[in-house]
């Protein structure tokens, strides 16, 4: 995963303390977006909990606290190619939605999140004169009280975190000061996208067959069994003559390297997967250091693996190129802009 997800935290000036630990999440640059929970205590503890609950697919990003959900909450997300020209669409959408619901004040932050929920509901392909992107309404199906019943040594810490979050985080229902159903919120979002932002919408509802395909593809990614079509979809490097693809599982997660080698010299390399660095430039500097050197495949893999181990990066299972899979599962076109 090359860029962090963003968190839109819906806040308003209310005298009453918030009751639900819920945020609206979005991604204004990355292709990957979801809703879920922050790190609860430490990575091993959280990973163990998620796997015991059967939640094998989640994004591990660093930092944060646990973020579990009231099952009636609704979130929104915008999925676009990594391009600056798309960044305003999300903010325009949120602004319009809040104004339509008479919410005077809200705040945008750029925190990081670890995600654990399944993706359900509507997926729409949006087009106007200047851009083409994907929009998703995401439903929350987690209940924060589950954590309180855990029989782990760190149970008390978990309870304390939950208590703190219930005092400090605010839900969409609280912002709008009314209950929000998924269907009503989706229709409101569609109205804003078409009437206010002048988008043409192609809507797709994921049926049972499409959802099975989507989750089967995610399972293939988890097992490092990726079809050639998926491997080639988002790589400009692979469209160049002489480019080869190396795929490798690293630690407990997934690492993928795209490389171009000519005359035994590494001309270009792009490393991606289910991991995050801080600062974010660290991985880019490492890639630049490798380029221009004579490296065979074995030595290159060794150097990259050594780098990750030295940086103490623990990658977790995550859906890689999730939007491409989502678009395919939803029956939408595979071409998105110039990517």
Short names for language-model regions:
Residues 61-81, 154-175:
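Residues forming anionic-ligand binding surfaces in small-molecule and nucleic-acid pockets
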Residues 107-153:
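A contiguous pocket-lining binding segment that forms or flanks enzyme active sites
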Residues 71-112:
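Contiguous, small/hydrophobic- and glycine-enriched helical/loop subdomains that border
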Residues 260-336:
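Active-site- and interface-proximal helix/loop "cap" or "latch" segments in soluble metabolic
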Residues 210-265:
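Structured beta-strand/loop patches that form or line metal/cofactor-binding pockets in enzymes
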Residues 162-205, 215-224, 229:
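A conserved active-site cap/scaffold subdomain adjacent to cofactor or substrate pockets
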Residues 102-109, 196-212, 297-301, 313-317, ...:
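Flexible, glycine/charged-enriched surface loops at secondary-structure junctions
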């Amino acid at each position: 995963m090359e860029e962090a997800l963003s968190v839109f935290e819906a806040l308003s000036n209310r005298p009453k303390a918030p009751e639900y630990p819920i945020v609206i999440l979005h991604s204004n640059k990355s292709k990957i977006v979801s809703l879920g929970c922050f790190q609860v205590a430490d990575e091993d503890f959280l990973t163990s909990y998620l796997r015991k609950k059967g939640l094998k697919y989640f994004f591990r990003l660093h930092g944060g606290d646990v973020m579990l959900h009231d099952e009636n909450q609704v979130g929104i997300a915008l999925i676009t190619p990594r391009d600056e020209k798309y960044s305003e669409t999300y903010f325009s959408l949120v602004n319009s939605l809040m104004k339509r619901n008479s919410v005077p004040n809200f705040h945008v932050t750029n925190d990081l999140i670890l995600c654990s929920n399944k993706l359900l509901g509507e997926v729409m392909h949006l087009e106007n004169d200047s851009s083409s992107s994907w929009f998703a309404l995401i439903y929350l199906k987690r209940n924060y009280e589950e954590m309180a019943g855990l029989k782990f040594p760190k149970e008390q810490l978990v309870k304390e975190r939950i208590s703190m979050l219930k005092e400090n985080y605010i839900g969409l229902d609280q912002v709008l000061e009314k209950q929000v159903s998924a269907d009503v919120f989706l229709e409101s979002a569609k109205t804003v996208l078409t009437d206010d932002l002048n988008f043409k919408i192609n809507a797709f509802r994921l049926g049972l067959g499409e959802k099975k395909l989507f989750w089967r593809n995610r399972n293939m990614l988890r097992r490092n069994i990726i079809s050639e079509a998926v491997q080639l979809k988002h790589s400009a490097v692979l469209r160049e003559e002489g480019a080869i693809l190396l795929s490798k599982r690293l630690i407990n997660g997934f690492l993928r390297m795209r490389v171009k080698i000519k005359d035994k010299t590494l001309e270009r390399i792009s490393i991606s997967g289910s991991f995050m660095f801080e600062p974010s430039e660290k991985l880019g500097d490492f890639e630049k250091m490798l380029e221009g050197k004579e490296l065979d495949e074995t030595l290159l893999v060794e150097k990259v693996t050594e780098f990750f181990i030295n940086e103490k990066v623990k990658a977790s299972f995550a859906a890689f190129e999730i939007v491409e899979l989502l678009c395919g599962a939803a029956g939408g076109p595979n071409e998105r802009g110039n990517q």
